[in-house]
Every structure is written in C-alpha cells, then in structure tokens.
Amino acid sequence: MSSEKLNVIALISGGKDSFFSLIHCIGHGHQIVALANLFPGPGPDSSSAISGGQSPFRREDATKAGSETNLQTPSDLSSPVGFQHIDPGTRTPQPPGPATGDHDSLREAQGAGESSDTDLNSFMYQTVGHEVLPLYADATGLPLYRLPITGRAVRHERDYDATANTQDKVQDSDETESMLPLLQSIIARHPEANAVCAGAILSTYQRTRVESIALRLGLVPLAYLWQYPVLPTPSADISADTQLLLDMANVGLEARIIKVASAGLDENHLWERVSSEAGSSRVKNALRKFGSAQGAAALGEGGEFESLVLDGPSSVFKKRIVIPEQGRRIVREGGGCSWLMLGGALLEDKHDATAKPAARIPNLLDPRFKTVFDDLPQPMNELKAAKACLTLLSQDAGTFTTDSEVLRWSVLPDLGLGEMSIQDETAQVVEKIRDLVSGAGVQLSQITSTIIILRRMSDFPQVNGEYGKIFTKPNPPSRVTISCGDLMPAGVNIAISLAAPTPRATQDRNGLHVQSRSYWAPANIGPYSQAIDVPVAAQGQPTGLRCISIAGQIPLIPATMVLPSTPEKPHELQIVLSLQHLWRIGQEMKIQWWTSSVAYFPRANSSEIQRSAQLAGYAWKQAHGSPDEEVDGDNGPDLWDLKYNPAYMSLGNDDKIARKALPDWEALTLRQQNEPETGIPPMFAAEVEELPRQAAVEWHAHNGLSGIEEASFSMCALPELTLPGWKTWHSAVTTTSATASFCFPGHLED
C-alpha cells in the first residue's frame, strides 16, 4: 500500500460523518467516483420488516430517473433487485410534503402495509432522512447508487465475522451483507474504483463491517474520522470532543439534527445546526445535564442524535438542499426518541462564491510526542544519563508467585529436506503450528501473539500469504516481524514464535484490528491485529488483571501508509512517531503500564546503532512523563458498547467509563510514585538486519497491563547470581488473590 491517489466510492447515509470523511478523501487528492447508499427496503425478507419503511420514492420512478441521463452504463450489466442508479442532473420526483395532508399518496409510494412512522433504528445504517438521499446526485454532481437493505442484524458481536453466517447455518443474512451487491454493482460500472470511505468515528461495530466488505472486494477502506476525538486539536483551549463539529463548520458543512434519542436531547433540538459552534455548544450543554456530554455523546456516536447534511464546500456541493418548514413533520416513537419525516425537499443554486478553507488535517504528533521530538537530539552526555536512569530500578525483597497459563512455541522448518522455497518453508511451519495448537487442545483463533523472524525481509510477501491461511477469524494475533540475515541457522529462512492460552484458561479475548486508513495509527491490512487482550489468572482463578500484546509499530504516516520524508530530523521523527503509534494503541486498549519494550534498528555501524539506542531510550523515558503530567483520556463508548457491554450500560456517570492514563502513575506503589524514574519500565535496543518497509525503527512492547488497582504495581530489577552481568526485570502486580510477576532478562555492559 502506498500514497497513490485512489478512486473512492463514498458510502453516505446523509449524515455529517460520512460526508466529512468524503471531504477528507478529496483533501488527500483522492477522486470520488460514486456515492453509495443503503435504504430501508420492503417485504418480510428485509430488515425493514422488523421496524422500518421503504423509501418514499416509487421504484419505477427512481429507475426511470436513473436512466434519463446515461452514465455510460453497459446494457448487459446485471443489477440486484431494487438497485437504483441516479445520475447528476436527474430530477427525481419528490413525494408530497406532510404539511399538504396528502399522506395517503406518501404511504402508497412507500408500499402497501409498510409504516413510515418508524425508523429502522439499525446499529449499522442511518436510515432516518433517507427520503432526501436521491437529491445528493444532483447536489454533488456525482452518480448515486442505492440498494434496499435486506436481512437483519444477525451478528451482534462487535467485531464482524462474515464466515460465521455460513458456519452457523444462519437462514437470514446479516444486514451488513447488503453492502456487498451494492458495491459490486458500482465496481462493475466504475472499474477504476479501488477504495471505499465511511464515517466511522468510534464505532468498531460499524468499522469492522465496512472493512469486511471492502477487503473482500479488494477495496482500500478509508476512515479518516476514526478516533478523531483523541487526535490533536489546533488549540489547547478547544475541547477535543467537539473539535470534529467545529472542523465541519469551518469547511461549510451544514448538518442538521433530524433525530434525537437521548436523555438531555428532545424534539426542541430537532433541526439544530449541529455543525456550528453555537449548535454544538447547545447540544453539549443539554447532554451535560445527564452526565453524558463527553467524548462519543457530544458527537452522537452513542446514538444520542442523527443528522442530515444539506450543504457543504463547493468542492463537494454544487447545489444546496432546502427543506421548507412545512416539510418537516415530527414523529414521536416514545422512550425519548423523536425524528423528522421530511418532504418537499428542493435544490437551490449556490450564490455565495466565498471559498471555504480546506479540511483541517490533524497534526502528525500529539502535544506529548511533539515535545519529545522537539527535545531530540540531546547532547550525548544527557542521552547517556537518560540511558543510565533506566537501570536505576529498585531491588525490593519479596517472594512473587507466578502461574503461567500461556503456551509458547518456537517453530522452524525441518532441516535436511533439501533446498526449499520460502513459500514451502512457510507452509511447513504453518502446518507445524496447526499440529501444535491442535495437540494442545486450543484453537488457532486463540493465539494471542506471534514473532516472525526472517532471513530476508524481501521474502515477506510470500510468507504473509501462507501465514494468513491460518488466521481467518476476526482479531488475529498481534505480530512483530524482523529480519536477522545470516544470524539465522544455516538452511533456515523463517522462524515463528507464538503464544496462546492453555485450554483451562478463561477464553475471554478482546482484540483491536483497524484495517482502515485514518489519522490515528497505521492500518493493519492482513492477518495481524494491533492488539490482543486476555485475562491473567493464577492457579486457575481470575486476578482481575489483563495482559495486552501489541503488534510491532513502524513509523508509517497513518493517513498515507508511507514513511515520513521530512528533512528535519528524519531519524528522530521515525523513532518518536512509531512510539506514538504504540501509545495510541495502548490508550485505546486501556493499558495502564508497560512491562518492558525493545526498539529494533536495522544494521548500521556501531556509532549509529549506539546513537539510535540512546535516542530511543530518551524518547521512552520522556514519553512516560511524570506523575504531575497525568491526564485523563476518556472518549466515551459507541452505540454497540451501550447496548451489549455491561461496563457502558449507563450514560449517566462518565466516571464509570473513564480510561486510565498511560502511564497510570497512581497504579505505582507510593514509594515509587515518589521516585518516578524507578518505575519507568526497562527499554532495550536490538540491532537486526532489516525491518518492514525499510523502516528505521520498530517498537515492540513486551506486555501492556490493565486492571491494575491503585498503588499495587511495582518495578524491580534483580541480579542473576549465576549469570554475571545479567539482570531480570520484574513488573509485579498485587491483587486480592495473587501477585503476578512479568519478567524480562537482560545483560548490562559496564
């Protein structure tokens, strides 16, 4: 994957997020080739049979309208049932406005027996306001393709598994799969399309479903708004949770609230222009009354409200949509939910030629890591002092109980079988892994982490193809990949180390696998997750701790997936940027403390390696900061969490869902809180042959820990009496049932 310009299909719901993601695509030089939309469909086989209605446009009208302006569509192209193609310039018939009293004709257009007074309320698709969607073709000058939603929400798990529909012999298809024929039909008409964009901000539920469909079709998934609230704001005075709305306002995006479903917001907030400073402030103030004004809630990510875009920058909107007041009828569903049924929508030419600024691109580095970067390079004597302080760890006496419920293997191909291709070697290693895992009574999907060591990094594409065959489920293990050249055993070109829980371990496994390009952290396209999170047990009993394995992080720019090319301190930037990636993933996984880390560097002369190690050591120390700098990084839950995750059942108390800071200094024992440098985890440097993408550094955190109680974590270093010069670093966590110790040995040179 590179920074090539992409031809993008934009998934739109009519809401603010999907259009703002489209605007960011244009800002990166990508071309939007088509708009795509899914809307409630009729009949018992569709999700609308449960609680929705059909588009208020007759299908024959839409089909006729779509054929009035031929978009070079071959006549032999097949289309799924209900497929709509609406060209720019087409005047799609509008249904009568609710204020005219002609509701019979409106219902007739929707289909007999279907109620229009109920929204679909899907976790996946926004459908309120769908009656206006056909106007977007003419408003934007882009072809619009639409398809009715079929099926229902069969798969309720957060991380979508498309294979489960077949394996579980589910009769009804999941509503997610409606995207597949829609995008296939668009690709047939626009074969140049190679990417798809969506507006996911914090919803893993939505993001993983779009990614599943996109990757099956060979499309690059783009989610430029992903984790937007944690990205740097232009000013420290601006609240991060509403910065997105202000950025929308700055580019001229006009988004109106058309549905409210939250304590704090009522029908008086309908038609509020949320993409404005005043509107976003009013929404946040209303939500604050019920303790839910932070993070996701202020953006509507928890389902608090939904919006409809009427206008935007001239790069997207050639005309604006106008809906008269008499065309906005309030529908009250009960339970605090109300929305607007819209009619009489019109298009108006835009007379204001004032150019709006381009969409703000968040800074590459957070303030914390920008400070770390600005402080590099330090004079060599200061760097050496920083390195030394990493070894000034306490040597507390004490007995720590350890009880590993982790299986570990290192797998190499068989020697003595003659020369094999790297693909054959990998296939043999993969088959050995299958046998080992099966013999241990665990599943391949339970593997938590792997380390791939290659002789040549150029072999990686062939290795990845075979390796990926054993990880077909969501959230594959995290992975670190390095090349060690001729340090590999003779005749061996690949070795894989892996870890998995024992069969008796609790199978409570969470993962983070972001495969979309964003501004947040590099996308992991392929069979490896950013992080895997499993519980820690002692003697078969839960401790409340969780251990997180993080993939190796190289310094790719997340939005473009290329290495930075800045002339200013390029080596230092790579060290700091990849460390920031590690931190962002750790914060998303609610990690409170690292046990240790290693920074891998490609082969270079000794002075360059020494300087790289010292720079990384200084950056590692500075990234930990001090207890005085601790901040809260909560961003709130998404809609799936609110319904299915017990930790997020109430919006009324943000303290219940607040994330701990990384590092969480309050987790340290009181003595180490007073001596913070003694609590910084050890960081090691290792010289290897090559790194992926010819990167200058790869950060590998050995373990991240969460669930640590206050004042229960300590770091200590104990000398190995039988091995002069060696020490073992212990990260010890005391719980109510046990003390868990995570160990890492290292050799110290004088």
Predicted regions span which residues?
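Ordered, small/hydrophobic-rich secondary-structure cores
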Residues: 238-239, 243, 247-305, 312, ...
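Internal, charge-rich low-complexity segments
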Residues: 42-74, 158-161, 229-234, 318, ...
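Short, structured patches in soluble enzyme cores that scaffold and shape functional sites
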Residues: 225, 257-262, 311-314, 486, ...
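Short, catalytically relevant binding-site loops at active-site mouths
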Residues: 202-205, 227-231, 262-265, 535, ...
